[in-house]
Regions:
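Gly/Thr-rich phosphate-binding beta-strand-loop-beta motif of the actin/hexokinase/Hsp70
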Residues: 1-6
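Mg2+-dependent endonuclease catalytic cores in nucleic-acid-processing enzymes, primarily RNase H-like
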Residues: 7-119, 160-171
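Charge-patterned, long linear interaction tracts outside catalytic cores
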Residues: 98-158, 163
Length: 171
């Protein structure tokens, strides 16, 4: 779980693989509240249950399909689009923590040459064949570029807090 605001990025926590989507959703909701996040993006590759659990908590999180269509015609898919935006963000002064694992993961994927000139990022399967781990920390940065984020209004915060009140049949 990570946070990007403007030119600053930090990893809030790392979680071991967990099959309990509710626990992950509760932790994500806590960070959303503590950090006053304007948007939460969840990797659709394993996060559909997390988003469903979040809906039960009154949350409106966005699933991101890395293989989905890119809004940038120069990119093969959403994954390539997000990597390109992260690259541009870093070039413009984006700051990442002093984390050797994150640094290595950001440098690991290679671009795949294509006849049509579109940017394609090496697949995780191909990275694994080269002996590289899945770039989970890097993915937590690049997913923050999935869609434009609009600052929430104070009314949005009230809607979330009021939607999480428990029903009391005796009240």
């Amino acid at each position: 779980i990570s946070l990007r605001q403007g030119l600053a990025f930090r990893i809030l926590c790392t979680l071991a693989k967990n099959d309990n989507d509710l626990i992950v959703a509760q932790r994500l909701a806590r960070y959303e509240d503590e950090e006053k996040a304007d948007a939460v993006f969840v990797d659709a590759g394993y996060g559909t249950g997390i988003v469903s659990a979040g809906q039960g908590l009154g949350r409106d999180w966005t699933l991101v399909w890395f293989a989905g269509e890119s809004a940038d015609p120069g990119c093969l898919n959403k994954r390539a689009e997000m990597w390109k935006q992260a690259r541009d963000w870093l070039k413009s002064g984006g700051a990442i923590p002093d984390d050797p694992m994150l640094r290595d993961e950001l440098q690991a994927p290679e671009t795949v040459p294509r006849v049509d000139g579109k940017i394609q990022i090496e697949s995780k399967k191909d990275m694994k064949a080269r002996g590289l781990p899945s770039p989970n920390r890097a993915d937590s940065l690049i997913i923050s570029f999935a869609f434009p984020v609009v600052k929430k209004s104070p009314l949005d915060a009230l809607r979330v807090s009021s939607s999480r009140k428990e029903y009391d049949p005796y009240a």
